[in-house]
């Protein structure tokens, strides 16, 4: 990882310590972070991003939920939130941006603060609109939602790929996510997964018939 990303020692140590802390604080969030970073790498390649943009997107994906370390665990893992608790959760993107200080460049910090922004301007914390978001911002938002739907949490099961594709499509139609990158996620990641899951269902059905 060091050689590929050409990070300074202090940056590398920061990321390692942060991931270790997150794994101890919230295994679910840690799993989500790793999942999002892998999805982001794949999307960057499929979208044809350059080497620098890909590196920054990957680092931003790893760091995007760092602000959740400042959210009480009982709130972070609560199935149903009050309005006040949800408002507290929503502060994590700003907190993440702030905690990075001058250690990472503005492109990476913007990925952290912007991952809940929406092209239609209804996101948080700043209510940015499509023209104010970078391509990497838009990709990370799609990866974040995909992973959140896909992975199980203590209060919910993970969704099958076909349902995730349906929700992403609806979100793109409403302007909550970028349509181009939703289509890319569906075509390159979810459709092959749907095919695999359908095949597994068929195999399980055949097994039941032969018992």
Spans of features found by a protein language model:
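Histidine- and acidic-residue-rich, metal-dependent catalytic cores
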Residues: 2-211
């Amino acid at each position: 990882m060091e050689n590929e990303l050409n990070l300074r020692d202090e940056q590398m140590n920061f990321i390692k310590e942060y991931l270790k802390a997150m794994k101890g604080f919230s295994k679910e969030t840690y799993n989500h972070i790793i999942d999002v970073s892998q999805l982001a790498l794949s999307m960057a390649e499929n979208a044809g991003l350059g080497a620098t943009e890909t590196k920054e997107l990957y680092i931003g994906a790893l760091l995007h939920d760092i602000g959740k370390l400042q959210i009480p665990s009982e709130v972070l893992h609560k199935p149903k939130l009050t309005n006040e608790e949800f408002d507290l959760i929503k502060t994590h993107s700003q907190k993440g941006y702030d905690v990075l200080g001058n250690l990472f460049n503005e492109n990476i910090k913007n990925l952290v603060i912007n991952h809940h922004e929406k092209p239609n301007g209804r996101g948080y914390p700043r209510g940015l609109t499509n023209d104010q978001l970078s391509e990497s911002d838009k990709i990370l938002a799609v990866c974040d939602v995909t992973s959140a739907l896909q992975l199980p949490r203590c209060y919910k099961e993970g969704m099958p790929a076909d349902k995730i594709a349906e929700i992403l499509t609806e979100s793109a139609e409403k302007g909550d996510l970028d349509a181009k990158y939703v289509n890319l996620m569906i075509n390159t990641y979810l459709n092959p997964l749907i095919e695999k899951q359908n095949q597994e269902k068929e195999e399980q059905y055949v097994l039941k018939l032969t018992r």
